Amino acid sequence: MNDAYKTYVPVVGRLLLALMFILSGFGKLGNIEGTAAFIAGGGLPAPTFLAVAVGALELFGGLALVVGYQVRLAGLALGLFTVAASVVFHAFWSAPAEQQYVAQLLFMKNISVAGGMLLISALGAGPLSIDARIAAGTGTRFKPALAGNA
Protein backbone atom coordinates (compact mmCIF):
# COMPACT_ATOMS: atom_id res chain seq x y z
CA MET A 1 0.00 0.00 0.00
CA ASN A 2 1.19 3.48 -0.71
CA ASP A 3 2.01 6.07 1.94
CA ALA A 4 -0.98 8.29 1.10
CA TYR A 5 -3.34 5.41 1.86
CA LYS A 6 -1.66 4.70 5.21
CA THR A 7 -1.65 8.41 6.03
CA TYR A 8 -5.20 9.46 5.14
CA VAL A 9 -7.39 6.37 5.57
CA PRO A 10 -6.92 6.26 9.37
CA VAL A 11 -8.08 9.88 9.58
CA VAL A 12 -11.19 9.19 7.51
CA GLY A 13 -11.93 6.07 9.57
CA ARG A 14 -11.57 7.98 12.84
CA LEU A 15 -13.87 10.74 11.59
CA LEU A 16 -16.56 8.32 10.44
CA LEU A 17 -16.50 6.39 13.71
CA ALA A 18 -16.39 9.57 15.81
CA LEU A 19 -19.42 11.14 14.14
CA MET A 20 -21.89 8.72 15.73
CA PHE A 21 -20.46 9.27 19.22
CA ILE A 22 -20.23 13.07 18.97
CA LEU A 23 -23.82 13.45 17.76
CA SER A 24 -25.10 10.97 20.33
CA GLY A 25 -23.16 12.68 23.12
CA PHE A 26 -24.58 16.08 22.20
CA GLY A 27 -28.06 14.57 22.07
CA LYS A 28 -27.74 12.97 25.49
CA LEU A 29 -26.24 16.05 27.15
CA GLY A 30 -28.87 18.27 25.52
CA ASN A 31 -31.69 16.14 26.90
CA ILE A 32 -30.55 14.81 30.27
CA GLU A 33 -34.13 14.18 31.46
CA GLY A 34 -35.08 12.14 28.42
CA THR A 35 -31.80 10.24 28.44
CA ALA A 36 -32.17 9.50 32.17
CA ALA A 37 -35.70 8.21 31.58
CA PHE A 38 -34.44 5.93 28.80
CA ILE A 39 -31.64 4.64 31.05
CA ALA A 40 -34.08 4.09 33.93
CA GLY A 41 -36.26 2.10 31.52
CA GLY A 42 -33.31 -0.23 31.03
CA GLY A 43 -33.29 -0.92 34.76
CA LEU A 44 -29.99 0.80 35.50
CA PRO A 45 -29.37 2.70 38.75
CA ALA A 46 -28.51 6.42 39.01
CA PRO A 47 -29.98 7.28 35.61
CA THR A 48 -29.25 11.02 35.74
CA PHE A 49 -25.61 10.43 36.67
CA LEU A 50 -25.29 7.82 33.93
CA ALA A 51 -26.93 10.14 31.39
CA VAL A 52 -24.31 12.81 32.06
CA ALA A 53 -21.43 10.31 32.24
CA VAL A 54 -22.41 8.52 29.03
CA GLY A 55 -23.04 11.78 27.19
CA ALA A 56 -19.62 13.08 28.25
CA LEU A 57 -17.91 9.81 27.30
CA GLU A 58 -19.48 9.83 23.86
CA LEU A 59 -18.83 13.52 23.21
CA PHE A 60 -15.26 13.73 24.50
CA GLY A 61 -14.32 10.24 23.32
CA GLY A 62 -15.57 11.14 19.86
CA LEU A 63 -13.65 14.42 19.87
CA ALA A 64 -10.51 12.55 20.95
CA LEU A 65 -10.92 10.33 17.90
CA VAL A 66 -11.32 13.34 15.61
CA VAL A 67 -8.08 14.99 16.69
CA GLY A 68 -6.24 11.73 17.28
CA TYR A 69 -5.49 12.24 20.96
CA GLN A 70 -5.39 9.29 23.36
CA VAL A 71 -7.22 7.21 20.78
CA ARG A 72 -6.16 3.92 22.29
CA LEU A 73 -7.87 4.82 25.56
CA ALA A 74 -10.84 6.47 23.82
CA GLY A 75 -11.29 3.50 21.48
CA LEU A 76 -11.17 1.02 24.34
CA ALA A 77 -13.60 3.01 26.50
CA LEU A 78 -16.05 3.62 23.64
CA GLY A 79 -15.79 0.02 22.47
CA LEU A 80 -16.49 -1.48 25.89
CA PHE A 81 -19.29 1.02 26.53
CA THR A 82 -20.88 0.21 23.16
CA VAL A 83 -20.86 -3.52 23.86
CA ALA A 84 -22.40 -2.99 27.30
CA ALA A 85 -25.05 -0.59 25.99
CA SER A 86 -25.91 -3.01 23.19
CA VAL A 87 -26.44 -5.90 25.59
CA VAL A 88 -28.64 -3.80 27.90
CA PHE A 89 -30.66 -1.76 25.40
CA HIS A 90 -30.72 -3.87 22.21
CA ALA A 91 -31.17 -7.38 23.63
CA PHE A 92 -32.96 -8.75 20.58
CA TRP A 93 -32.96 -12.26 22.05
CA SER A 94 -35.43 -11.16 24.73
CA ALA A 95 -37.37 -8.55 22.73
CA PRO A 96 -40.99 -9.11 21.71
CA ALA A 97 -41.26 -10.80 18.31
CA GLU A 98 -42.38 -7.62 16.54
CA GLN A 99 -39.30 -5.74 17.86
CA GLN A 100 -36.65 -8.42 17.36
CA TYR A 101 -35.64 -7.48 13.82
CA VAL A 102 -34.96 -3.81 14.59
CA ALA A 103 -33.31 -4.66 17.91
CA GLN A 104 -31.04 -7.16 16.16
CA LEU A 105 -30.08 -4.59 13.50
CA LEU A 106 -29.22 -2.04 16.19
CA PHE A 107 -27.32 -4.64 18.20
CA MET A 108 -25.26 -5.80 15.21
CA LYS A 109 -24.56 -2.22 14.10
CA ASN A 110 -23.31 -1.36 17.56
CA ILE A 111 -21.21 -4.51 17.87
CA SER A 112 -19.61 -3.69 14.51
CA VAL A 113 -18.81 -0.16 15.69
CA ALA A 114 -17.38 -1.64 18.90
CA GLY A 115 -15.12 -3.80 16.74
CA GLY A 116 -13.86 -0.68 14.99
CA MET A 117 -13.22 0.95 18.36
CA LEU A 118 -11.24 -2.05 19.56
CA LEU A 119 -9.17 -1.98 16.35
CA ILE A 120 -8.40 1.68 16.97
CA SER A 121 -7.40 0.86 20.54
CA ALA A 122 -5.01 -1.80 19.24
CA LEU A 123 -3.61 -0.03 16.17
CA GLY A 124 -3.55 3.60 17.29
CA ALA A 125 -4.48 6.82 15.58
CA GLY A 126 -2.23 6.77 12.55
CA PRO A 127 0.32 9.34 11.41
CA LEU A 128 -2.02 12.36 11.17
CA SER A 129 -2.81 12.65 14.86
CA ILE A 130 -1.79 14.34 18.05
CA ASP A 131 -0.72 10.92 19.35
CA ALA A 132 1.77 10.55 16.48
CA ARG A 133 3.15 14.04 17.11
CA ILE A 134 3.60 13.25 20.79
CA ALA A 135 5.34 9.97 19.95
CA ALA A 136 7.64 11.78 17.50
CA GLY A 137 8.51 14.36 20.16
CA THR A 138 9.57 11.66 22.62
CA GLY A 139 12.02 10.16 20.18
CA THR A 140 9.74 7.31 19.16
CA ARG A 141 9.16 7.19 15.42
CA PHE A 142 5.75 6.19 14.21
CA LYS A 143 5.99 3.55 11.52
CA PRO A 144 2.72 3.39 9.57
CA ALA A 145 3.43 -0.16 8.40
CA LEU A 146 3.46 -1.31 12.01
CA ALA A 147 0.74 1.08 13.20
CA GLY A 148 1.59 0.20 16.76
CA ASN A 149 3.45 3.20 18.09
CA ALA A 150 0.78 5.88 18.03
Where are these regions (language model features)?
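Extended, low-polarity transmembrane helix blocks
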Residues: M1-G30, A40, P47-A56, F60, ...
